[in-house]
A protein has these predicted regions:
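Cap/lid segment of the alpha/beta-hydrolase catalytic domain
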Residues: 107-178, 236-245
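Short beta-strand/loop motif that positions the catalytic acidic residue
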Residues: 277-286, 290
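Short beta-strand elements
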Residues: 7-36
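N-terminal cap/lid segment of alpha/beta-hydrolase-fold proteins
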Residues: 32-35, 44-96
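Hydrolase active-site cap/lid region
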Residues: 140-144, 207-258, 314, 325
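Alpha/beta-hydrolase fold nucleophile elbow
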Residues: 193-204
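C-terminal catalytic histidine-bearing segment of alpha/beta-hydrolase fold enzymes
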Residues: 234, 292, 299-343
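Short beta-strand element of the alpha/beta-hydrolase
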Residues: 86-91, 96-108, 128
Length: 343
């Protein structure tokens, strides 16, 4: 519920309150071919060689872990040409195998987001992969930015939500969700990885990607930690949030789509529908005052997770952000779900 307090006809304060959030029911809109749609995408991805290329960054590798710049191939954008995605990969120098955290990134609004590079002495005893999905972050900076020129022609530069809007088979998030799966493929191909102990986290768009990874990753993730996740329950999202509703409405007008057609298209990418395929443990952070990914849109997928163990952390004063201790919260959760590895 949104509460507005006025005095003398002026707004004094407005804020959100809530109760019994696990009782929130979002109207079902999963299409009958939802699973087939994603199975087809995964089959197409499997036919694309990973072709991983790792470049050691010696300048960043002075401590306990080597830091690599990594490039790999993913599913095409509808033109038949594989897309290159990039990231940073941190691996302990010491012999042995290690658990993994894959971090998915938020929306690269305006091409201004910071690019996270794991620290050579950070997160001891863990492998980390921070991946930039198609068109965003590393892929949206020189010398790679020219690869992305075609994204902007559909609406606005750096507005990936609009790319091939209305066509589920070539839409941006079909490819981007497959990039998430490809990041798991890459991790599983690396010799120092404990394949029994792969975890994924991400905030905002990255939260949606973490949900997609658990839903579409063929059970290879031990647990996920999505925070303030994007892409949840579009019919209600567009009633309570200004963006991406504004982009969707602009594309709807441009393409002359009625509401039923638009929401059917978006249902294939809605985290509330992907959540029905998630069975691994989940911990999720939610900002009660979030105007970008409002709490309702976070609980839409949360309440549909099929996981036997799931937890939510509502941060009552947070907007589109997570509290300072969120990293330690989800890492503790991941450590609780480490499986014993037989050597």
């Amino acid at each position: 519920y949104h509460v507005a307090v006025e005095a003398n006809y002026s707004l004094v304060r407005d804020f959100n309150i809530g109760y019994d959030p696990t009782a929130i029911v979002s109207a079902p809109d999963m299409q009958s071919d939802f699973t087939d749609f994603w199975d087809t995408a995964k089959t197409e991805l499997a036919a694309v060689p990973i072709d991983a290329r790792l470049t050691l960054r010696e300048d960043l590798s002075t401590g306990a872990r080597n830091i690599y710049f990594v490039e790999m191939q993913s599913i095409d954008n509808g033109d038949g040409n594989p897309v290159t995605i990039r990231g940073y990969y941190a691996v302990p120098k010491a012999e042995g195998t290690y658990p993994v955290v894959i971090t998915q990134n938020g929306y690269d609004s305006g091409g201004l987001s910071d690019i996270y590079i794991p620290d050579t002495n950070g997160n001891p005893g863990w492998i980390e992969l921070n991946i930039s999905n198609r068109g965003q972050l590393i892929n949206n900076r020189d010398p790679y930015k020219e690869e992305n020129a075609f994204y902007g022609k559909y609406y606005l530069p750096d507005e990936w939500f609009a790319y091939n809007f209305g066509d589920k088979d070539t839409y941006y998030y079909r490819g981007a969700y497959m990039d998430v799966v490809r990041s798991i493929d890459f991790i599983c191909s690396q010799e120092k990885v404990q394949k029994e102990n792969i975890f994924m986290t991400g905030g905002s768009q990255g939260g949606a990607f973490a949900i997609a990874g658990a839903a579409l990753g063929d059970g290879r993730l031990n647990a996920i930690a999505p925070s303030i996740p994007f892409m949840g329950d579009f019919p209600d999202y567009f009633k309570v949030g200004s963006w991406p509703a504004s982009t969707a409405r602009a594309m709807q007008e441009k393409l002359d789509l009625d509401n039923a057609t638009m929401y059917k298209f978006l249902s294939y990418f809605d985290t509330k529908n992907l959540a029905t395929l998630v069975t691994c443990p989940v911990i999720s952070a939610i900002g009660l005052q979030d105007p970008v990914c409002p709490p309702h849109t976070n609980f839409a997928p949360y309440n549909n997770f099929k996981s036997e163990e799931k937890h939510y952390v509502v941060n009552p004063e947070c907007k589109h952000e997570t509290p300072a201790d969120w990293y330690h919260t989800y890492m503790d959760f991941f450590k609780q779900h480490l499986k014993t590895v037989e050597h």
